[in-house]
Amino acid sequence: MSPNPLQKPAIDAAPAPFADFAPPVRPQSTLRRAITAAYRRPETECLPPLVEAATQSKEIRDAAASTARKLIEALRGKHSGSGVEGLVQEYSLSSQEGVALMCLAERPVRIPDTATRDALIRDKIADGNWKSHLGRSRSLFVNAATWGLVVTGKLTSTVNDRTLAARVTRLISRCGEPVIRRGVDMAMRMMGEQFVTGETIEALKRSKELEEKGFSYSYDMLRERPTAADAERYYRDYESAIHATAKPRGRGIYEGPGISIKLSALHPRYRQAARVMGELLPRVKALALLAKNYDIGLNIDAEEADRLELSLDLLEVLCLDGDLSGWNGMGFVVQAYGKRCPFVLDFIIDLARRSGRRIMVRLVKGAYWDAEIKRAQLDGLADFPVFTRKIHTDVSYMPRTQAACRDRCGVPQFATHNAQTLAAIYHMAGKDFHVGKYEFQCLHGMGEPLYEEVVGRGKLDRPCRIYAPVGTHETLLAYLVRRLLENGANSSFVHRINDPKVSIDELIADPVEVVRAMPVVGAKHDRIALPAVLFGDARTNSAGFDLSNEETLASLTEALRESAAMKWTALPQFATGPAAGETRTVLNPGDHRDVVGSVTETRKRTHGAPCACRRRGAGLGGRLAERAACLDRAAELMQARMPTLLGLIIREAGKSALNAIAEVREAIDFLRYYAEQTRRTLGPATPLGPIVCISPWNFPLAIFTGQIAAALVAGNPVLAKPAEETPLIAAEGVRILREAGIPASALQLLPGDGRVGAALVAGRDAGVMFTGSTEVARLIQAQLADRLSPAGRPVPLIAETGGQNAMIVDSSALAGQVVGDVITSAFDSAGQRCSALRVLCLQEDVAGPHPDDAEGRAARHCISAAPIVFSVDVGPVITSEAKDNIEKHIERMRGLGRKVEQIGLASETGVGTFVPPTIIELEKLSDLQREVFGPVLHVIRYRRDDLDRLVDDVNATGYGLTFGLHTRLDETIAHVTSRIKAGNLYINRNIIGAVVGVQPFGGRGLSGTGPKAGGPLYLGRLVTTAPVPPQHSSVHTDPVLLDFAKWLDGKGARAEVEAARNAGSSSALGLDLELPGPVGERNLYTLHARGRILLVPATESGLYHQLAAALATGNSVAIDAASGLQASLKNLPQTVGLRVSWSKDWAADGPFAGALVEGDAERIRAVNKAIAALPGPLLLVQAASSGEIARNPDAYCLNWLVEEVSASINTAAAGGNASLMAIG
C-alpha cells in the first residue's frame, strides 16, 4: 500500500470538532425568538392576523378614501407625469425601450474607454422605437430625454443608402460618435439628477428650496459592496457627512437634517457575526457619538433579510450603551415586505423602553424583493422571507401604525409614495399631532409632488423628510437603476397614478379589503414558485439550510457535534458482504489531529472478487418505475440525514458548511433528476452491463452518487471506487442507497488507492464512468482501447476532467459585481472545483496599473481555517502532495518575475494543509503549463481590439469546461459565446455551482467526453440504444445533409438515401431549450455540431452511413485516406465537399471531435488503440460492423455527434429582475 499523505504524527490533542461552530452572538429573548420564528412563515399563516390587525372602522376607511382621492386628483390635475413619474410611465419595463433605458442608465458614465461606451450606446439604443414615445408626455423632462434617444437611435442604426436622408444620417453617424456619446451622457446625467441630491454632502444648497416649504432631509452616502479599503473610505465619508449636515445647528433631531448609514458599506464581511461585533461595532458607535454631539438623527439603513438579526444585535448594543444615553437620534429601517416586520417593530419598541430612549423607526415597503425571492429559490429554503404579492406588503405596513403613534418610545417615519397608504396613516394617527409624533418620508426625485399636497398649512400639515442620496453619478447609477426598476414596474403606484387607464377607485381601494376578498387570504403569487416546487411536478427541489436563522444554526450545531462523535468506517462491500483488508485512519485535512474515522482498503487478492459477482450479480432489475422509486427513497433518506452527512463531509473533505450543504443537495438532486428522467424518457432500454464508477475527492458524495444513480437506474450493476482521500462519505452514501432498496449485488464498494481503480478498469466490465484529472482519463482510455464490449463495440467511457477556466471582463461590466463573482469562482472550496476560475482576463481600460488590486483586497478578507467553524471562507487543500504542487507553481511564477499577491495564514492553519488565496499576474495565457487545482487565480490584461485573439488563446488551451463573461453588451455576449469552445457558459455571474437539471455540467476537448451530468442525454450513454432527444421547434435539418441525400439518390443508393433521411429526422441539431430555474436567470441548453469527425470506413456503404450521420449533426469530416474510398465521393455537391477532407496522418490533421469506425472486432480494436494514442482531446469513438450498419439505422448514435452547451445568464445583472418586478 502506498503511504497516505494525510497521515502525520499527532501533534496536540485536537479540540472537539464543532465545539465553537456558531456560538450565538447574544442570548435570544422571547421577542427575538418571535422574530426568528416568523422568518419564513407561510404567507397563508402571516396574512390573516395582519388583515385583522389592519382593519379599520368604516369611518376611518371612508375618510382615508376621500383624502386619497383628493391627493390623486391634485396630482393628476397639476401635471401629467413630470420628472421621473413621467419617465417610468412612458418607458415601462414591459417595453424594449424601458429595459434599454434601465441598462443605459447604469453604465455609460462608468465605462472608462470611449470605444466600449459607444458600443453600449449602439447596443441598447439602435433597436428601440424611441420615436413612438415622442410627444406622448406633456413633461419637458420626458420629451427632452426622448428627443435625445430618437436622434441617437437614428445615428446608430443601420441605414439605407438609397435615400438622401439616409446618406446624411450615415455621414453624421460616421462623424458624430462624440456627439452621440455626449448626448446620451447628458440624458443619463439628467435622469440621475432626478434621484441624486448632489455629488458631495457639502452640496446641500439644492435642499434649501424644499426646506423652506417645510420639508426636512435625511442624507445617505450610498455605497456599493466594499473591500476593506473601500469600507475605511466610506467611514470617513460618513464622518464628513455628519459634520457637514450638522453645520446649521439648533434645529434638533426631528426638524433638522439627519444621516442614514448602511452597515454593509462599513465592513467587507457584513454577515459574519463575530467579526462584525468586534470590528464594525466600534466604528458605528463612533459615528453615533458624533451624531449625538451634534444632536442629529442617525438611521441604520435596511439590508438583505439574512442580515436583519445581525443588524438588530448591533442596534441593541448601541441603544444600551451608556455613552449614548440621553440621545433620541438612533433610528432603524424596517421593511414591511418582510414576514418578520411586526415582530421587529415589537422588539424595537421594547428596546426603546429598556434603554430609556426614543428610537426612530423608518417603515419602508422594502428594497430587495426580487433578490430575496431568487436567494430562497437558489438555496432551497422552506419559504421566502418576504411576501410574494405587493398588496400583502401594503397590508403588512398598516397594523402597527396606531400603536406606534400612541407609543412615545418610538418615532414612526412612514416612507411611502402611495396616496392610499398615506391617507390611511393620516386618519389612523388622528388629529392630535405635534412635531416628533410621527413623520412621512419620500425619496428625492420621486415623492415631492405628492408630499407638496401634505406639507404645510392649508394642506394636511404633516412633516415629510426626503431621503436624499448623495454622491457622484458614477457611484449612484446602480441606485438609479433600482429606482427605475421599482417604479417602472406596471404594478407600482408611481407607474399607475400616471396611467389614465387606471381609475382613481382602483388606486384608493383599501388593500385590507382587497386581500380579505381573495379566495384564500394570504395565498402566494401563482407566478412565483416556492423553492421546493421550483421544478414543478417533475421533481422536488432539494432543501438547504437557512444559516442566517439562529434556531437553524443552533440545531445544526448540535447535529454536527453528534456527527463528530460517531464512529465512521468504510469497508469493501461486495455482493457477498464486507471484505477484510488493511485498515488506516482518515484525518481531517484542516486539522491532522482530528481522526475522522477508518477505512479498510480493498486487497489486491480480492480485486477479482467482484468479477465473480459481476457474472452472477444482476443490475437493479425490476421495472423502470421500481428503479426510479429506489432513487427517490434514497433522496428522501439523504435529505433527512443531511445534518449528519454535513459533519462528515466538512471533516473528511475539508469543506465549509455552505459547500457541504451544496454537496448534499447536489447528490439529492442527482437522485431525483435521474429518477424523473428514467420515467419520462428511458423506455424499455437494454442496460450495458457492469459499470465501474471512479469518483473524485472534491465532490465525494455528489459526483459519487450521481454516477452510481445514473448507472443503477439504467439497469446496470455498479462497482464503485471512491477517491482514496474520501472513502467514509462514499461508504455512507452506499449504506443509504442499499437502505433505499438497492440490492448488494447491484452496488459494490471498493475503497482503495489508484491501483484498485486500475484493476477495475482492466476487468471485463461494460463501461467506465470517471471524474478526475485529464492525465488519468487518458490512461483509462488507453487501457479500455485494448478490448471491446460484449456487443463488440468500444467500451463506453464517460470522463469529466479538468479545465483551464477563464472569465473575460470588459470595461462595461460592473466592478463590484465582478469582484464578488471572481472571488467566489476562484477561491470557493479552496479553488478545488473542476469549474473554478483559473484565469481572469481584464480589459486593460478597466484593469488599471494593477489589475488584481480589487480582487486582492477582497481576497484578504477570506478567512482560511479548518471549516469546523461557520465563519470560514476557504478551507484546506486536500493533501500535502496537493499543497506542495500548488506551492511549486507559485514559486515558479515568482521565479519568472510574475507579480504574486497572497494573504497571510493564521497560525492555527499549521495543523492542516492550507494554501492562502493567491493572485498571480501573467503576461500571456501560455505562461500556464497545466491546470493548477487550488486557490490560485491568474490575471491577464487584454486590449479591446484583441478580444477575438484572446478567445482564440482560451480555445487553444484545449480545455473547454467552464467560461465566464462579464459585459453589458448584448452584441459582445452573442459574439463571444458563438466563438468560445466550452461546455458551460456563465454570463454576468460566477462560474461555479452548476445545478442538476438547470445547468447540465460537462466539458469538451481536454475537459471531457460528454454527455453532461444532470442533462437529458446522460442516461442514454448507459444503455445499448439511447433514446432520441426531445424534439423542439428549434431543431432543424442541416441543408447540407439534404444535398447529400439528393446526391445519393442520383447514384441510386436507395438504402443509403433512406439512412440519410432517417438521420436527418432523428438528429436533435439546433435544439434550444430554456430549462426551469430560479428567477433572475435564463438557463439555456443547446445542441451544436461537435466539430470535425474522423471517419474510418471499410466499405462504400459504410462511408455513406458515416457521412450522413456526421452531416445530420452539422459536422465536418476527415476521412481516413487509407480506406481507399476517395472515388466513392467524386462529384459531391459543393456544399458537401466543403465539409469533407481526407487524412493520411491523424496526429498531424487532428484534433478531432469524435470518430466513427467500421470493421470487424480486430479492426475496431486496432483503430481504437490508434485513436487513444493521439494527442489532444479524449475522443468518443463509435464503431460498428458492416453487417450492423446495413441492419441498424441507429448503428451510430447521433447523440454523441452533437455538442451540449449550457448557458446561464444573470438577467438581473443590471440591478434587478425586470420581469419579476413587473408581476409583483
Curated annotation (Swiss-Prot):
Pfam families: Aldedh (PF00171), Pro_dh (PF01619), Pro_dh-DNA_bdg (PF14850), PRODH (PF18327). This is Bifunctional protein PutA. It catalyses: L-proline + a quinone = (S)-1-pyrroline-5-carboxylate + a quinol + H(+); L-glutamate 5-semialdehyde + NAD(+) + H2O = L-glutamate + NADH + 2 H(+). Its cofactor is FAD. It comes from Rhizobium meliloti (Ensifer meliloti). Residues 576-1032 are annotated as: Aldehyde dehydrogenase. One of its GO terms (biological process) is proline catabolic process to glutamate. GO terms for molecular function: 1-pyrroline-5-carboxylate dehydrogenase activity; DNA binding; DNA-binding transcription factor activity; proline dehydrogenase activity.
